[in-house]
Amino acid sequence: MDNRRYSKIEVSKQIRFDGDNMKIKDILANKKVSVSLEVFPPKQSTAFESVKTAVHKLCDLQPSFMSVTYGAGGGIGWHTAEIAGFVQNECSVPALSHLTCLLSNRATISETLAQLKEKGIENILALRGDVPPDSSFIPAGDFNYASELVEEIHKNGDFCVGGACYPEGHVESEHIDVDLDNLKRKVDAGVDFLTTQMFFDNDILYRFLYKARERGITVPIIAGIMPVTNAKQISRICKLSGTYLPQRFKAIVDRFGDNPDTMAQAGIAYATEQIIDLIANGVNAVHIYTMNKPEIAQGIMNNLSSIIAD
């Protein structure tokens, strides 16, 4: 069986926000091309305005939705909630707020969800969160797995809940099959859609999609794409996530990595090529990790303009 063509492509308009389709599961149900963007909140209050400026430029690209990550150390923090509210209420783009649980208890999660409700945020990406490097770390007690957070979110309101998945397996997982079993439990807990960790070889994703569907995981899976624009960035990414780098991508980094402008252009081109191949093979939902760089996202969106045009 050809794992690359696991579903039939429908090249169509990219979905736009119309005020009534705030929930991501409804956006994805249209089965049209969806390109969404991710941003991270400021670490300090003094950087809030500069992040808002970048977010506004990204929103001008009319993504299907925009996700806002949690800060270092987990949790949501007021910065994440404020940026998510700005995206949705000021920029009229559906917001997806990340939420981690490893360092939180039920009371904290309930309070956070209430804050998000007040801002009209309906989409949550439920994450366990990274384990701190300190080997003596002990979880807060109420949550050990993302599946437990998914259940708790649903108890607190009518949220659309997303989850993370790992085409190459989670770094803590002993085998991809074990990882898929855990993923199935998370989906069964009430996940409406999944977003993948970054990958640089599309064949890895196609194999993962085939295995996931075999396991009965039928929710939409959004492909996460990271445009790599400098050589130091890719070294850090691979060290943290164990992401595989195909030889053709290594050649790009080796050839252009010392020139920031050239590497940025090559990184945009590589990400664009990945996305075009994904859409051509039936993966209609793509999520771009922008690193708060509007010019990078704009370069990719310009390259895709005819594919996602109205």
Model-found features: residue ranges?
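Active-site pocket-lining/capping segments in soluble small-molecule metabolic enzymes
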Residues: 140-166, 216-268, 273, 304-310
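Conserved beta-strand positions in the central sheet of alpha/beta enzyme cores
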Residues: 36, 67, 125-126, 195, ...
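Active-site mouth loops of central-metabolism enzymes
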Residues: 36-50, 96-107, 162-178, 256-269
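Active-site-adjacent beta->alpha loops and helix N-cap segments on the catalytic face
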Residues: 24, 47-48, 74-86, 105-111, ...
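Short, acidic/polar
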Residues: 45-58, 80, 106-113, 175-185, ...
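N-terminal amphipathic alpha-helix/helix-capping segment at the start of soluble metabolic enzymes
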Residues: 19-37, 44, 309-310
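Active-site beta-loop-alpha junctions enriched in small/polar residues
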Residues: 39-42, 69-73, 98-104, 129-130, ...
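Conserved, mostly hydrophobic/aromatic
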Residues: 38, 66, 116, 186, ...
